[in-house]
Amino acid sequence: MKNSKYLETKMVEFKDLGDERGSLVVCEGGQDIPFEPKRVFYIFGSDDTVVRGQHANRDSEFVLINVAGKSKVKVMDGLGNEMVYSLNRPNTGIYIPKMVWKEMYDFSADSVLLCLASTHYDAGEYIRDYDEYVKAVKEAESQF
């Protein structure tokens, strides 16, 4: 698994600064996550039969946080390695580096999946075909 990008994918835990009034979770760019967020979006209203994502990004890094409900995230590196993460606490997330295939699924009815991205949206940096992704990964691996 030399240079496997999925090995760089990791769970992150955020500070819960709450008190008797409730919870307050803080996520600061460049401190709690390894980039300054340029884009924020969220996914909700998906049920447990829906699969979202199904792409890799050439230039964007992400942190995904289920701020409500739960979901699962499968990451793949194009070299046969994969890992599944369960997101079910609003103070934990998953960091996903560039060029990692991601699929989000098994959404609970109340799921709100918050996504922080390191770049502004650019449709050209998305790889939406898995075979094309595997080819790009293998080409990059052959240069090492």
What residue spans do the PLM features occupy?
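Well-ordered alpha/beta subsegment
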Residues: 89-93, 99-106
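Non-catalytic, conserved peripheral segments adjacent to functional cores
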Residues: 1-92, 109-110, 116, 121-132, ...
